[in-house]
Design a protein with these regions (language model features):
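Acidic, polar low-complexity linker/tail segments
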Residues: 8-66, 71-78, 91, 227-229, ...
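Acidic/histidine-rich, surface-exposed loop or edge segments in extracytoplasmic proteins
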Residues: 60-73, 154-161, 242-248
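Sec-exported extracytoplasmic/periplasmic mature domains
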Residues: 87-95, 179-187, 208, 268, ...
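Short acidic, S/G/P-rich loop/turn micro-motifs used as interaction or catalytic elements
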Residues: 71-75, 107-110, 207-214, 249-253
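DG-centered beta-turn motif at the end of beta-strands
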Residues: 68-71, 178, 196-209
Length: 290
């Protein structure tokens, strides 16, 4: 009888230990699931973006505005050079920067961009968790970046495919107006996605031609500009970085090198865009001659 009671106690004790181990194991699993879920949640990117332009809902870190002068036609080889340069620009654009394509005609700046999209980021720019699909959808990342690349490239190609012609070329006024339109850069966080600086890339032959100032009529030197009303009308202190891709032309003996120097002088002496600014104003001659 005593032996039977001892056996029952041993079985009961063994059963209690087994139950404890099961409960402990279940708790370990639950804690692991909660910890794993918290880790995934903590590492998920919480920057919301718009479906239409792929830009953060809070705003882009900066805008790169391409301003295409459509007042005179461009040689096919020059158009190809522009396409190659813009493709490189799109590939190197930082994540959550906006790129917008604007045009100017004889009436000035068209304030509505032909296309405007933000770089949502390439998959190879993401962390391992995103690439492996734990905290993001890799295919969705690829699809968004493909939309950004293809839509912007298509807009540039279609715009360059048009015939350009106009009675005047209001370049300085268009630059001035575009500068006033660009939204202020936004910092998305304090470490990884800081606010940048807006940038305008002007693609033009630099031949300003308006009733206020004409580089066809007046000499291509700073004195002729200063003697006109152009400084008063078009003058502006630019916070944006300015870059110019110069379309080469052979017009009325006007030297492309003199045009380049004149624009550098105008920005330095009249617009306060110092030659010592970082980055400085750059004027890059495009391939071809029209």
């Amino acid at each position: 009888m005593a032996k039977s009671r001892r056996s029952r106690r041993r079985r009961k004790s063994s059963s209690s230990v087994g139950d404890f181990i099961k409960v402990f194991a279940i708790l370990i699993v639950i804690v692991s699931i909660i910890a794993g879920g918290f880790f995934v949640w903590w590492n998920q990117e919480n920057i919301e973006t718009n479906k239409s332009d792929l830009c953060p809902t809070d705003g882009a870190r900066a805008t790169v505005a391409i301003l295409l002068d459509t007042t005179d036609d461009i040689a096919p080889v020059t158009k190809t050079d522009i396409q190659n340069r813009t493709a490189k620009l799109l590939n190197e654009l930082p994540r959550f920067y906006r790129v917008s394509l604007y045009t100017l005609n004889e009436d000035g700046l068209n304030p509505t961009p032909i296309a405007t999209l933000c770089n949502p980021g390439r998959l190879d720019e993401m962390g391992k968790l995103e690439r492996d699909g734990y905290t993001a959808n890799p295919q969705m990342i690829k699809d968004k970046y493909s939309k950004f690349q293809q839509n912007m490239s298509k807009a540039i190609d279609q715009t360059l495919g048009q015939k350009f012609d106009a009675q005047q070329s209001p370049l300085l006024g268009s630059l001035q107006n575009l500068s006033l339109l660009l939204p202020k850069p936004v910092a998305l966080d304090a470490e990884k996605y800081l606010a940048g600086t807006n940038k305008i890339i002007l693609i033009s032959d630099l031949l300003e031609f308006t009733p206020v100032y004409s580089m066809y009529v007046q000499n291509t030197n700073l004195k002729s500009f200063q003697n006109s009303k152009a400084g008063e009308k078009f003058g502006k202190q630019y916070d944006e970085d300015i870059e110019i891709w110069q379309v080469q032309r052979n017009r009325l003996g006007i030297s492309n090198k003199k045009l380049k120097k004149l624009w550098l002088d105008i920005f330095d002496k009249e617009f306060g865009y110092s030659i010592y600014r970082d980055p400085p104003l750059t004027i890059t001659p495009l391939v071809g001659l029209e």
